[in-house]
């Protein structure tokens, strides 16, 4: 079924009639129009003009369908550009032209204008039309009759944050000055004569400059441009103005504007918006004229004639208010005994102003995370009500929230529509969707009417009630579906309509309650940061209800056709999953975008596998002869199809919250249900004894489903929770920009760091020109803010320790930028002082150091994050390719189809392995081992997907169906691109984290060790060739030089890697080169040394040194990847100690130190440990005393060994060779005694753990003594 629409192509000034499917989205419609007419382009959209009494003007959203907007045949839509130039004027007369998006509402356009002008707090500004009326912030320009040629005025509507505007914000200061000046002159802010004189003098200083006695004399000023009307004829007023002006000599224009604004702020009526109202006073029939004034703090009521203030109330005293066509009613609760009813032609404007001020107040409290005190809770129940015939209307909806003093609740437009049938319910739902959209902070809109409910409920109770009402709405929706599909047995159409109308009323009552609750969520400090998500879920529920009601409204009579039933059932599935989504939203548990997309693609894969199975199943039904079994199979086929739809709908809704237990449970249950039904279908066909070949085909399809379900389970295991990160410094949010979707943070860090370095260099070069310093500073600050924004994005994915480290870094950068700002301003004021120049240079250098460190640290985390994300993207795209391949195999010759299916199966196994690697990194994100394992898996498991891509592209031309061929080619290209992205991410990870240098280093060490082992074989065989022309003394000297160089490089590596991880690659490269030099020198020495035993000893020590260096390199990578991690640093220290011991042993064996006793002691200890303490089984001691005796002897021997070791150290330091030999023999003897007692203790104890502990401790102590002797020999050799 299609509909015919008249499309007015505005650019070509023609109208064409085209046909569209009702379920086409607006984007598809625009593409269709472009293809048919060759008019327009990406900037064009569809616009529905205003229809009096039926439809307000609106732009149709690209993602919505024609059916959603209830577009019927023969209606006309405009096809035109969304953007147009629009002129707006400032109060100083300046006219600016800006390109605006017509589809945006006024609030969004004002946001855009303010952003370009550098105006903060855009929510306080709005546009005024030529008649002096404020435009409605929630409506588009064309809806309010603003054409391209009209000029609107940008003005400050709300005076709330203007106290924060100072001399450093010249744009806003100028706009505020002009608006204050006009307000004073027009009499909006009544002033005394002295106040008017002071303000006029400041205005003279701004506009005329310093006082000039020859020029500035009475008669010079046009007084009506400086004074309000009431003081124009005051005696000597111009002379008094110049008298005050004379006092302001040398005051700058900016300071004069600032003083002017400050003085205006001190006025009681400052920022007051006035409305002419009438009040019927007690005992009088005639209405009395008054002025109602509203400021950021209070409401004032004044007599029109005398301007006497007869009533004031802080805004927080207003319990509720209501606007009708010609009146406005205020309820002050306990502060007044009666309602204040005002007759006014502008009730809606008053309502908007009060609502706007309170919204800004509550937003400011929410943003600063302040807890609302008890005395402020009155503002929490301020509400707007619909009032008819002067009475305050009570709303029956949502009375449980904000019940402070029994106040009534706001009746939004969506709540004012009486629900008499499904179409009225549908209109109310559409209005509710618009209202919810206005409440989302991301839109920047300022909704007209807020329902504010700071309630006595705790956040947990609030969440519980919100979820309860959501559940109730879902139950009501299920009831509506049953009524639609199962009409009442009696009563006919009337009973049917009555039943579904009653259901619609229940649905709308609950839906409005949910919508109201969602709006109030933002005013709970604990929920403010994720209130948009809650509103988003409420919006989705409303949209789903709208679609369900639309389906119901199309039912003719009492019969719901199969297509409508299926569409309605889909919405019921949708609503059920959205109930769970609301639970997750209230708990603020969301996963990363890559995790969500992966899960959705896996669900699509399952759904496609089920669809393939259903195709086969439906084609084999004809083989079933048993009618009972046939009915069972047909029912199972139908229920499996529904479950597949439910799975896809549920996963698409809940994928973003798959870390929440309820979301995961629901997805798992539906997935398992689909699997069970598939197996049941297979069993039923088997009972029907269908041909074996057909059964095998069906079995293969069920196997595909099982594989796809496994991928869903893996995908949920890989889900990563994402956190919203807020970093503040001195109460100021740091890094307020946004990261665009799809931004490669790894590349972004490199780019921003480079831009920041260039900006700092530019600033340094501009120090000779004070006029350009601030511009240079702004560039530096902009790049620093961008870097902080990127860091926040990375921190949202990091572990707690890394987050804290990044927070500290961003705060340090922010404070450094602030210091740089202060120094720049001081320099501009006094450019001659060299101290300011020095401070700028010093602070800029410090900032550069901080940003480089932060960029390196966050960049590494971004690398592993990108590796995970691109792994998931690859899995998602390849999963889609698997699904497409399975379907495509049916269109290929048998042999080719089998090959394609086999390739798909191989890929499923590869994806499962890769997801296991992702899961490990998610569970332990700091582990270098799991990161390297994921990197290896990503490289290895990318081969099967690429093979499948190659197979698909090879077989694609053979596919008979052209559409399927195109799908396979498209899916293959997407999969190939995702694999390429993953490979690039892997290379970036290795490059940025220093892993390329480390991998090269490890390869060098493997090669060196292999070469040493070859030399070891040559030594054992006796065919090691000496190097001609090389003496042992010369080789030993070269080795000592190489060892000293290695020692220096290793010290630098161990020290610098802790404070500057960015140097990992350079440090590792230097250490590898030095170690290679040591190995080459040691090999030369071995060739120049005679005697196999000596050669073997040197070779063994050199080989051990290379192994220890390899471990040192690995440990340094761990420290660089996990800064300030105690475990990694402990590993580095241990590896460094092992290298030192091996180096000392090599020096001791190399040096020509004639100390026979020392060598003998070292050999004796080695033999002792290997023979007597090699293992528990080798201990054959026969103790003669008790276990306790030997424990005491071990302690005594340990003390003796310690004393002997200290003597060895003393002799080595004094280079007393003779004393060193004697001390070494004593130490060996003490160790021998200790070993003997340890053996006896091991034999006596029956505890295996104690045995192993004594053995390990003794062997370790012996190893340390050997190392000590080697160090001593190295000391004697001047090492």
From Swiss-Prot:
Domain FERM, residue spans: 84-365
GO cellular component, one term: cell trailing edge
Sorted UniProt keywords: Actin-binding, Cytoplasm, Cytoskeleton
Membrane-spanning residues: none
CDD domains (alphabetical): FERM_B-lobe, FERM_C_Talin, FERM_F0_TLN, FERM_F1_TLN
UniProt GO BP: actomyosin contractile ring contraction; cell morphogenesis; cell-cell adhesion; cell-substrate adhesion; cleavage furrow ingression; mitotic cytokinesis; phagocytosis; sorocarp development
Cellular localization per UniProt: Cytoplasm, Cytoskeleton; Cytoplasm, Cell cortex
Organism domain of life: Eukaryota
SMART domains: B41, IRS
Keyword Cytoplasm: yes
GO MF entry, a single one: phosphatidylinositol-4,5-bisphosphate binding
Intrachain S-S bonds: none
Function: Actin-binding protein that may be involved in the control of cell motility and chemotaxis.
The organism of origin for this protein: Dictyostelium discoideum
Protein name: Talin-A
Pfam families in UniProt: FERM_f0, FERM_M, IRS, Talin_R4, TLN1-like_RS
Gene3D superfamilies: 1.20.80.10, Alpha-catenin/vinculin-like, Phosphatidylinositol 3-kinase Catalytic Subunit, Chain A, domain 1, Pleckstrin-homology domain (PH domain)/Phosphotyrosine-binding domain (PTB), Talin, central domain
Lineage: Eukaryota, Amoebozoa, Evosea, Eumycetozoa, Dictyostelia
């Amino acid at each position: 079924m299609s509909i015919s629409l008249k499309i007015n192509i505005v650019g070509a000034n023609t109208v064409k009639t085209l046909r569209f499917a009702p379920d086409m989205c607006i984007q598809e419609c625009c593409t269709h129009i472009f293809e048919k007419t060759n008019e327009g382009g990406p900037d064009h959209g569809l616009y529905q003009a205003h229809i009096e009494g039926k439809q307000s003007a609106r732009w149709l959203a690209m993602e919505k369908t024609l059916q959603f907007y209830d577009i019927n045949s023969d209606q006309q839509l405009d096809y035109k550009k969304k953007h147009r130039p629009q002129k707006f004027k400032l109060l100083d007369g300046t006219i600016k032209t800006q390109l605006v998006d017509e589809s945006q509402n006024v609030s969004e356009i004002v946001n855009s204008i303010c952003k370009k002008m550098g105006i903060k707090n855009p929510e306080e500004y709005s546009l005024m039309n030529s008649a002096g009326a404020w435009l409605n912030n929630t409506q588009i320009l064309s809806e309010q009759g603003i054409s391209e040629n009209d000029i609107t005025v940008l003005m400050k509507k709300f005076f709330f944050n203007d106290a924060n505007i100072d001399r450093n914000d010249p744009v806003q200061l100028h706009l505020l000055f002009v608006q204050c000046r006009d307000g004073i002159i027009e009499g909006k802010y009544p002033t005394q004569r002295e106040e008017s004189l002071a303000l006029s003098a400041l205005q003279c200083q701004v506009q005329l400059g310093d006082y000039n006695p020859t020029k500035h004399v009475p008669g010079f000023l046009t007084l009506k441009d400086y004074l309000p009307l009431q003081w124009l004829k005051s005696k000597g007023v111009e002379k008094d103005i110049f008298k005050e002006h004379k006092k302001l000599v040398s005051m700058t224009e900016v300071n004069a504007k600032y003083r002017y604004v400050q003085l205006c702020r001190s006025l009681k009526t400052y920022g007051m918006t006035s409305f002419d109202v009438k009040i019927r006073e007690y005992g009088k029939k005639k209405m009395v004229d008054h002025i109602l004034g509203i400021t950021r703090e209070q409401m004032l009521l004044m007599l029109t004639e005398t301007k006497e203030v007869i009533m004031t109330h802080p805004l927080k005293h207003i319990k509720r208010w209501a606007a009708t066509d010609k009146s406005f009613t205020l309820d002050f609760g306990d502060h007044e005994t009666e309602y204040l009813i005002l007759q006014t032609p502008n009730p809606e404007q008053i309502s908007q102003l009060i609502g706007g001020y309170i919204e800004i107040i509550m937003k400011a409290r929410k943003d600063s995370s302040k807890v609302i005190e008890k005395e402020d809770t009155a503002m929490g129940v301020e509400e707007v009500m619909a009032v008819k015939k002067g009475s305050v209307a009570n709303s029956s909806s949502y009375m449980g929230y904000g019940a402070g003093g029994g106040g009534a609740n706001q009746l939004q437009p969506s709540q004012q529509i009486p629900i008499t049938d499904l179409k009225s319910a549908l209109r109310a739902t559409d209005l509710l969707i618009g209202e919810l959209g206005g409440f989302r902070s991301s839109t920047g809109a300022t909704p007209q009417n807020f329902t504010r409910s700071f309630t006595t409920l705790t956040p947990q109770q609030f969440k519980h009630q919100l979820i309860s009402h959501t559940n109730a709405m879902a139950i009501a929706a299920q009831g509506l579906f049953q009524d639609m599909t199962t009409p009442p047995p009696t009563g006919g159409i009337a009973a049917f309509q009555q039943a579904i109308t009653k259901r619609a009323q229940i649905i709308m009552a609950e839906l409005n309650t949910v919508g109201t609750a969602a709006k109030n969520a933002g005013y709970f400090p604990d929920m403010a940061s994720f209130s948009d998500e809650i509103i988003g879920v409420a919006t989705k529920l409303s949209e789903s209800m709208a679609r369900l009601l639309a389906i119901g409204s199309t039912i003719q009579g009492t019969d719901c056709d199969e297509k409508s039933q299926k569409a309605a059932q889909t919405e019921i599935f949708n609503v059920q999953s959205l109930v769970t989504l609301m639970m997750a939203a209230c708990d603020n548990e969301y996963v990363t975008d890559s995790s969500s997309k992966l899960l959705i693609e896996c669900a699509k894969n399952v759904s496609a596998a089920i669809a393939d199975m259903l195709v086969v199943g439906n084609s084999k039904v004809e083989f079933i002869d048993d009618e009972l079994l046939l009915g069972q199979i047909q029912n199972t086929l139908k229920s499996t199809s529904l479950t597949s739809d439910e799975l896809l709908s549920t996963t698409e809704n809940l994928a973003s919250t798959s870390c929440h237990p309820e979301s995961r449970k629901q997805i798992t249950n539906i997935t398992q249900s689909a699997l069970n039904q598939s197996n049941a279908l297979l069993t039923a066909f088997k009972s029907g004894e269908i041909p074996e070949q057909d059964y095998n085909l069906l079995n293969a399809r069920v196997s595909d489903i099982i594989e796809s379900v496994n991928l869903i389970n893996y995908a949920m295991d890989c889900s990563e929770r994402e956190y919203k990160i807020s970093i503040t410094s001195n109460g100021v949010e740091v890094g307020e920009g946004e990261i665009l979707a799809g931004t490669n943070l790894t590349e972004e860090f490199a780019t921003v760091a480079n831009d920041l370095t260039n900006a700092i260099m530019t600033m340094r070069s501009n120090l000779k020109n004070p006029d350009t310093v601030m511009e240079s500073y702004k560039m530096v600050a902009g790049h620093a803010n961008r870097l902080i924004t990127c860091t926040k994005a990375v921190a949202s994915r990091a572990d707690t320790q890394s987050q804290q480290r990044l927070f500290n870094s961003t705060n340090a950068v922010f404070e450094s930028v602030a210091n740089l700002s202060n120094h720049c301003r001081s320099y501009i004021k006094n450019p001659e002082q060299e101290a300011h120049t020095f401070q700028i240079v010093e602070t800029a250098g410090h900032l550069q150091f901080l940003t480089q460190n932060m960029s390196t640290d966050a960049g590494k985390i971004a690398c592993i994050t990108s590796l995970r994300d691109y792994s998931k993207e690859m899995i998602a795209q390849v999963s889609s390719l698997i699904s497409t391949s399975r379907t495509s195999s049916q269109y290929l010759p048998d042999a080719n189809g089998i090959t394609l299916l086999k390739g798909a199966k191989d890929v499923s196994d590869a994806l499962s392995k890769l997801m296991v690697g992702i899961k490990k990194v998610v569970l332990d994100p700091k582990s270098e081992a799991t990161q390297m394992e994921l990197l290896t898996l990503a490289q290895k498991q990318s081969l099967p997907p690429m093979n499948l891509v190659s197979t698909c592209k090879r077989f694609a031309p053979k596919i008979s169906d052209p559409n399927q061929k195109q799908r396979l080619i498209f899916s293959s290209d997407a999969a190939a691109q995702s694999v390429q992205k993953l490979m690039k991410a892997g290379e970036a990870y290795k490059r940025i984290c220093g892993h390329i240098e480390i991998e090269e280093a490890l390869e060098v060490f493997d090669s060196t060790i292999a070469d040493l082992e070859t030399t070891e074989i040559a030594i054992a065989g006796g065919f090691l060739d000496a190097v001609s022309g090389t003496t042992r003394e010369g080789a030993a000297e070269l080795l000592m030089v190489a060892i000293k160089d290695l020692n220096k490089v290793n010290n630098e590596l161990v020290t610098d890697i802790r404070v500057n991880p960015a140097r990992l690659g350079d440090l590792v490269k230097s250490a590898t080169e030095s170690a290679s030099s040591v190995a080459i020198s040691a090999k030369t020495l071995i060739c120049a040394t005679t005697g196999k035993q000596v050669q073997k000893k040197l070779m063994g020590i050199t080989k051990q040194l290379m192994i220890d260096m390899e471990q040192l390199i690995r440990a340094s990578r761990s420290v660089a990847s996990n800064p300030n991690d105690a475990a990694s640093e402990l590993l580095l220290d241990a590896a460094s100690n092992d290298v030192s011991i091996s180096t000392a042993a090599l020096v001791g064996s190399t040096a020509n130190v004639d100390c026979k006793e020392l060598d003998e002691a070292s050999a004796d200890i080695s033999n002792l440990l290997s023979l007597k303490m090699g293992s528990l089984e080798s201990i054959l001691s026969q103790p003669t005393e008790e276990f306790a005796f030997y424990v005491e002897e071990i302690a005594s021997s340990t003390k003796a060994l310690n004393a002997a070791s200290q003597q060895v150290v003393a002799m080595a330091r004094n280079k007393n060779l003779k004393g060193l030999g004697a001390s070494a023999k004593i130490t060996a003897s003490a160790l021998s005694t200790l070993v003997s007692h340890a053996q006896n203790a091991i034999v006596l104890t029956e505890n295996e753990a104690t045995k192993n502990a004594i053995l390990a401790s003794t062997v370790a102590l012996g190893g340390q003594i050997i190392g000590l002797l080697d160090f001593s020999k190295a000391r004697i050799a001047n090492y």
